[in-house]
Amino acid sequence: GKSTLMKLLMSVFNVSSGEIYLDLKDNKKLYIDKNSRKMFAYVPQGNFLLSGTIRDNLLIVSPNATDEEIYSSLKIACADFVDTLPSGLDTMLGERGIGLSEGQVQRLAIARAILTKSPILLLDECTSALDEETEKRLLQNLVNLQNKTCMIITHKKAALSICNKEVCIEDKKIIVKEN
């Protein structure tokens, strides 16, 4: 249900009835369709990286990003461990990120999403492999992002604590609670 909802937002699946739209601040509605996909950056549960360098894996979403933009996204995603690797951004990875821990792969996937500059981040269990301290820093960094909306699927209270709204799916109904 939850991951499917995110895929509906990105128009990966078509709705069988009804409509999907975003309520904007100026009381306008933005209807979601395949043309609105660029508004979303999705970090799926069970992230993956391709074989190649860390730089290649980040630039795949933003080929013209500068090193400054890359390092900024790495810092926000608490992926500054890249600086400690012998070849830094040019460190070679195996398929699916072999050579890195699951938590490091998650943070690189988040950095990649931030690098897209999409206004809405969809994060599906994106902190599941992070230790408590790293998760806390990452979540605070996400709160501090300007002009970004983050939608987080989580089972962890730490992630829920930074959210201003909680959306629950109960008995096939969407319930929105203010936090």
Language-model region placement:
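ABC ATPase NBD Q-loop/coupling interface
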Residues: 14, 19-38
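A position-specific signal in ABC ATPase nucleotide-binding domains
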Residues: 13-14, 162
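ABC ATPase nucleotide-binding domain helical subdomain, centered on the C-loop/LSGGQ "ABC signature"
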Residues: 19-26, 55-95, 139-140, 147
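Helix-to-loop junction immediately C-terminal to a conserved catalytic motif
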Residues: 10
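The conserved phosphate-sensing helix
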Residues: 51
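ABC-family ATPase nucleotide-binding domain "signature/switch" substructure
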Residues: 4, 41, 46, 54-57, ...
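Conserved glycine(s) of the Walker
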Residues: 1
